[in-house]
Structure formats: C-alpha cells, structure tokens
A protein has these predicted regions:
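Glycine/proline-enriched, intrinsically flexible loops and inter-domain linkers
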Residues: 1-176
Length: 176
C-alpha cells in the first residue's frame, strides 16, 4: 500500500444572525477552499464514503435558525491510522438573543457491531470494515423561535432541514 495523507476539515453550520438564517455547511478554512468531492476522497484514500448529507435538526432554533451541519460516514477499505482533532464536542454552539443551541460536533467509531464516541483529539488504528461517522455542528439560532414565520418553518420542513417533531417542539406557532 502506498503512503497517503488527507487533511479534511468538515463543514459546519453558521449561527443565525439578525436578519438571516445561518449558512448551511460552511467551510471554516483557508479562503477560497471547499469540501473535497467524494470522488476525490475515494480515489486518493483507502475509504468508501457511505454517507454525506445535511444533518436534519442540527440547526439551532430561532427567529433566524442556525445553519445545518453534515453527517458523513467513511468505511475503511484497509487497515489505517487516523488522527482526529475535533472541537466543540461538549458544549454546543449557543444561540443569541434567546435563540436555541445548535448541535455539537461528534465523531463515532463503528467497529464490529460496536459503537463508541471518539475523543476530540486522538489517534486511532482502524481495521478494514471499520467506519468513522462525523457529525458536524449546526449553528445556534438568533432570536425567539416564536417569532419565526410560518412560511419559513414550512419551507424548512419541505427542504428536510427539520422534522415535524422538531418543528412542533421549537415552533409551537406552526400552522400546517
């Protein structure tokens, strides 16, 4: 096997702000960069991308909701070593002016029908068939969720950004 290395900072949701929802899947990295296409990851690294999707309900509620994080899953195709450096795993992104918290970052290791949370900074020896699941954070909301318009809530539901359960919990003013 050829040596390889990949440094992949994963996108997160930006917090809502006075006047707008947070940006979804924002890449906080060097200017002008973006997340690598799945095909590039798979062609250059010994893993299979099993999932990469917007994380429903990861946004913090508010008049202006936070942006959504991502759910990514990588299955290892051979034995390999991985280093993870993930911040904001214990304390989720806070909301502002009574907005709600977004989802915290989390990394999960699936190994032979066993799941465990990965420490925020660690090195791991992974075996063929092991999967790493990255759940990137969603942004906190801005303003009281009771002030979010019904039109925006319905659009979030239509887009799949939030579930009906999430909407009922955080937006009691919802009229379906």
């Amino acid at each position: 096997n050829e040596p390889w290395a990949d440094g992949s900072p994963h996108p997160i949701g930006q917090g809502g702000f006075n006047g707008g929802d947070g940006i979804t899947s924002m890449h906080h990295n060097a200017a002008g960069t973006r997340i690598s296409p799945t095909e590039i990851w798979e062609s250059r690294n010994p893993w299979l991308v099993k999932k990469i999707e917007l994380a429903q309900n990861s946004c913090g509620p508010g008049e202006y909701r936070g942006g959504l994080g991502l759910d990514l899953e990588f299955e290892m195709l051979e034995e390999t070593y991985v280093t993870t450096v993930v911040e904001r795993t214990k304390f989720p992104p806070w909301g502002i002016n009574e907005g709600g918290e977004g989802r915290a970052n989390n990394v999960i290791l699936n190994r032979k029908n066993e799941s465990s949370n990965v420490p925020k900074k660690t090195g791991l020896k992974l075996h063929k068939g092991d999967s790493l699941i990255f759940k990137t954070g969603g942004g906190g909301g801005y303003g009281k969720s009771s002030l979010r318009s019904n039109k925006k809530i319905l659009n979030d539901l239509k887009q799949g950004y939030i579930s009906i359960e999430y909407a009922k919990k955080h937006y009691p003013q919802l009229k379906v």
